[in-house]
């Protein structure tokens, strides 16, 4: 029997023993060594050759991943590991570290119970380290730490034992500060900081395949002094043989990460708001493989032979071929064609996948990343909140008109596979817009359409996504219907930043119980009476109904909300989305005859009232900004900081780290287009840098008129603004 077949059989045997299952993700900042580490674990489990581990990058299965040397998609694999005489099944997801692909990390965290955070010993905790930790902790996923590239401290930087200890302790301290800061208000999480003594921190070199932790040193009798001697003498093979990385890391996974039986009672209440007393809630908490089927889809991929594959976590019940299951948000049922598990880029079909495991399913044609799939209709899981929103848009056109239907189908598939991509399809003009997390994100999507689907495309210049927001309180404004029989009286004011953040993070939404929503918003600073009058939340905008006993308003409210959403999706300045508004409906006059207060009357009246209130509230254009970090040799520091300042940016900090200077600052996304080639030439290719989306800020007053005019022209809108907009 082939080795692979044997592993699949071992996995199938262990699937029914949730106490010996570990569902884990490996996450880190870009280039800190996640995928190389994953290769080591696969080699340790006998799934790839030990000789090529670290070079094979077995989880980077896409051609563009191997070309760019970065992980773009999250890849899944199941393997086995013996720990304390007991075989364990480890379902592992290797995630991307580049900020543009953070959506994959967010979705992976929903499927797992533990996150192995990898940090480069030389660079330390970086911006994306903080982001992946936040994503893990928000989902109730327990972290452990592996400090990689320790060989560089010994061989390259020639650090002595004291220097090295100081540096490693500083990395641990930084990670623990982040964990403490993020969990202090989470009542259900005890102390999840990591520690060398407890064995939740490992050190080593994924490239040279050795690793150590406190338990492994006690077991092998090796200490750091001996490791430094072997590393300096270039005896890395002996190091690998005496303290193999895969054993150290997988032992840590088995010992310190919770199994599904321990994890699900804590995680289910965080991600599911259904009836906590129901049988279904019990089945999920107890990982009952005989209960109703509940699958949370975290990823959609396409196999050229099998079609669409939905990957996700089975929280309850057992998945089997032929089952007919409900998919949240769609009517009818989907029939399962096959179930399987992942072995790197390959899917292995199995007969069944019980609760507590990560499964690969075909046949769920209506599922998207984030769907809840179940054998009985149920309250779906909380939607997966992505930490970043799209900030760059590109137009995409097929070079040949004959390819248009195929391109539209491909773009719809892209949006299904990656919910952080927004696709706008215009069948009339043939020009379609895709919005994503950054230039690289959209570049990769464009290349995959051409390479995988064989559709030659033209893409436009990157366009930055703007927002509009009120800056002060408006007066009460009247909106009239075209027939003059209906009137709405509305005022608008800016929402507090904490309230906007609470909505963004999914901690307050219309899907949750009213009392919970009220409490969350009051905690964020909302007035108690206001929190009780909420009628609707759209994006990060809240509608309050402050009317008293108005006839026919109840049956008209749906149209009011429709008019409100239309007005907020296309702001009055440049038809960009409005954010952070508190809209008060004070009063309404409605015609008693329903025929005179239909959609054609109510929607324009509300839209007019909302737009005029926003104008009265000094609405301004907001632009997206990015945090920028540049690591550069001392003599190029001036050039690096000049690159930020020359882009309307601001340098917030400069400090020495090892032999490099670090420049940190903030710059507008619009000015960061083309940054990579400019920073390379300014620093003679000596700089490494990282950008991370940091929300939106008000565009400077002197730039507002030109930018509004430019956007309106691009959208084919007339240049004249509403005459009330006179504050420029």
From Swiss-Prot:
Gene3D superfamilies on file: 3.30.230.10, 3.30.70.240, Elongation Factor G (Translational Gtpase), domain 3, P-loop containing nucleotide triphosphate hydrolases, Translation factors
Domain tr-type G: 19-261
UniProt-annotated location(s): Cytoplasm
Protein name as it appears in the record: Elongation factor 2
Organism listed in the record: Haloarcula marismortui (strain ATCC 43049 / DSM 3752 / JCM 8966 / VKM B-1809)
Family (UniProt): Belongs to the TRAFAC class translation factor GTPase superfamily. Classic translation factor GTPase family. EF-G/EF-2 subfamily.
Annotated binding of GTP, by residue: 28-35, 94-98, 148-151
Molecular function GO labels: GTP binding; GTPase activity; translation elongation factor activity
A GO CC annotation given for this chain: cytosol
């Amino acid at each position: 029997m082939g080795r692979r077949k044997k592993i699949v059989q071992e996995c199938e045997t262990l699937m029914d023993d949730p106490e010996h299952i570990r569902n884990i993700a490996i996450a880190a900042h870009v280039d800190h060594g996640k995928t190389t580490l994953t290769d080591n674990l696969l080699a340790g489990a006998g799934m790839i050759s030990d000789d090529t581990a670290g070079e094979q990058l077995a989880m980077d299965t896409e051609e563009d991943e191997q070309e760019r040397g970065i992980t773009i998609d999250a890849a899944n694999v199941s393997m086995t590991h013996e720990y304390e005489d007991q075989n364990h099944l480890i379902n592992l997801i290797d995630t991307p570290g580049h900020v543009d692909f953070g959506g994959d990390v967010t979705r992976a965290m929903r499927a797992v119970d533990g996150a192995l955070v990898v940090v480069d010993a030389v660079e330390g905790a970086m911006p994306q380290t903080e982001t992946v930790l936040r994503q893990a902790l928000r989902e109730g996923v327990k972290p452990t730490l592996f400090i990689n590239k320790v060989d560089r401290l010994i061989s390259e930087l020639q650090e002595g034992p004291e220097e090295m200890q100081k540096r490693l302790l500083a990395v641990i301290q930084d990670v623990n500060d982040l964990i403490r800061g993020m969990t202090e208000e989470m009542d259900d999480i005890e102390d999840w900081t990591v520690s060398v003594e407890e064995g939740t921190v490992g050190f080593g070199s994924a490239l040279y395949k050795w690793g150590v932790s406190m338990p492994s040193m006690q077991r092998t009798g090796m200490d750091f002094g001996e490791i430094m001697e072997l590393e300096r003498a270039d005896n890395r093979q002996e190091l690998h043989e005496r303290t193999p990385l895969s054993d150290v890391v997988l032992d840590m996974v088995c010992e310190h990460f919770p199994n599904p039986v321990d994890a699900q009672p804590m995680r289910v209440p965080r991600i599911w708001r259904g009836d906590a007393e129901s049988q279904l809630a019990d089945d999920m908490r107890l990982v009952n493989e005989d209960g109703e089927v509940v699958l949370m889809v975290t990823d959609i991929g396409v196999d050229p032979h099998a079609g669409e594959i939905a990957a996700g976590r089975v929280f309850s019940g057992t998945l089997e071929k032929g089952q007919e299951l409900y998919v949240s948000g769609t009517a009818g049922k989907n029939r399962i064609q096959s179930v399987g598990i992942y072995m790197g880029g390959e899917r292995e079909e199995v007969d069944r996948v019980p609760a507590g495991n990560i499964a690969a399913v075909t046949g769920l044609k209506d599922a998207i990343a984030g769907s809840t799939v179940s054998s009985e209709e149920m309250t779906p899981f909380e939607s997966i909140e992505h930490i970043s929103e799209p900030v760059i848009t590109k137009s995409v056109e097929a070079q040949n008109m004959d390819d248009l239907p195929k391109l539209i189908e491909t773009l719809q598939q892209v949006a299904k596979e990656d919910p952080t991509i927004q696709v706008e399809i215009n069948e009339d003009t043939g020009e379609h817009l895709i919005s994503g997390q950054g230039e690289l994100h959209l570049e990769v999507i464009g290349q995959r359409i051409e390479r995988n689907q064989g559709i030659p495309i033209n893409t436009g210049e990157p366009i930055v996504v703007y927002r509009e927001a009120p800056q002060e309180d408006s007066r009460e404004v009247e909106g009239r219907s075209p027939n003059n029989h209906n009137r709405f009286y509305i005022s608008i004011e800016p929402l507090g930043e904490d309230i906007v953040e609470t909505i963004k993070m999914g901690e307050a939404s219309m899907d949750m119980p009213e009392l919970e929503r009220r409490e969350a918003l009051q905690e964020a600073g909302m007035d108690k009476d206001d929190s009780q009058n909420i009628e609707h939340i759209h994006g990060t905008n809240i509608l309050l109904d402050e009317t008293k006993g108005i006839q026919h308003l109840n049956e008209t409210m749906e149209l009011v909300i429709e008019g409100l959403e239309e007005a907020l999706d296309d702001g009055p300045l440049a038809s960009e989305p409005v954010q952070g508004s508190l809209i008060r409906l004070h009063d309404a006059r409605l015609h008693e005859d329903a025929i005179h207060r239909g959609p054609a009357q109510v929607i324009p009246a509300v839209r007019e009232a909302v737009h005029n209130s926003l104008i009265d509230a000094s609405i301004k254009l907001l632009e997206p900004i990015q945090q920028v970090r540049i690591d550069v040799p001392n003599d190029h520091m001036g050039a690096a900081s000049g690159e930020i300042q020359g882009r309307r940016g601001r340098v917030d900090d400069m400090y020495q780290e090892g032999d490099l200077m670090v420049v940190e600052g903030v710059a507008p996304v619009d000015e960061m287009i083309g940054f990579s080639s400019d920073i390379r030439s300014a620093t003679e290719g000596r700089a490494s840098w990282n950008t991370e989306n940091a929300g939106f800020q008000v565009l400077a007053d002197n730039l507002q008129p030109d930018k509004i005019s430019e956007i309106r022209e691009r959208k084919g809108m007339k240049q004249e603004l509403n005459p009330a907009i006179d504050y420029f």
